[in-house]
Amino acid sequence: MYRYKITIEYLGTDLAGWQRQAGVMSVQQILEEAIYKFSGEQVILFGAGRTDAGVHAVGQVAHFDLSKYLEPHKIITAINYFVRPYAVGVWNCELAPNNFHARFSATSRYYIYRIINRPYPSVIDLNRAWWISSPLDVPAMQQAAAYLLGKHDFTSFRASSCQSKSPIKTLTELNIIKEDEEIKLYLSAPSFLHHMVRNIVGSLVLVGKNIWQAEQIKDVLEAKDRKAAGPTAPASGLYFVKAAY
């Protein structure tokens, strides 16, 4: 068997997320069907990040196995040909060791969350960022973010449907940068809880609106209660950037 590692980008707006689900179109299903069309093999694709409906990716990593060797550049061309009806594309493919696993071999995952912060919406960024019309206090958000760095119990920031065995996660990066009318939040960790990034963003926006003081983020973290945190930020602003191995 030959194991292939591919890097994928997609717009999640019209898709049901990464994971295959009955009755809806997912990124996993689109790619698995494309691979079957040129290889004749039914494969199972394993992804580094199981993104939700509406979430985008610029560097999602996945792997699959084929019984016969195909040149990586031909795989890229073939997949991109058969996924053309959808906003999904592969921009890298390489052979990987048989013990490589896109999900379990990853040592870190990186996300960006985009906020358009101006009085009027951005047509160009429709469904690609969270538009917030009122000015956000970025220094206050940065101050609040510092409380979340490191190893913590992130129960307050996990979805009620989260299936992770433990709420303990280590947030290694949470940087907030304002560039003109756009605010970007950069987050990285070995792994994340379901909705963790979006719940963190929703809570930091309450700080940015001066509804909460920066110090309240520490109280929310210590509460270990989802009801203590802010709303879940829209999926449209979230991007899976890359996985490190």
Swiss-Prot record:
GO terms for molecular function: RNA binding; tRNA pseudouridine(38-40) synthase activity. It holds the Pfam family PseudoU_synth_1. Homodimer. This is tRNA pseudouridine synthase A. The keyword Isomerase applies. Belongs to the tRNA pseudouridine synthase TruA family. GO terms for biological process: tRNA pseudouridine synthesis. Keywords: Isomerase, tRNA processing. It catalyses: uridine(38/39/40) in tRNA = pseudouridine(38/39/40) in tRNA. Substrate binds at residue 111. InterPro entries: PsdUridine_synth_cat_dom_sf, PsdUridine_synth_TruA, PsdUridine_synth_TruA_a/b_dom, PsdUridine_synth_TruA_C, TruA/RsuA/RluB/E/F_N. The gene is truA. Formation of pseudouridine at positions 38, 39 and 40 in the anticodon stem and loop of transfer RNAs. Its EC number is 5.4.99.12. SUPFAM superfamilies: Pseudouridine synthase (SSF55120). The active site is at 52 (nucleophile). Coiled coil: none annotated. CDD domains: PseudoU_synth_EcTruA.
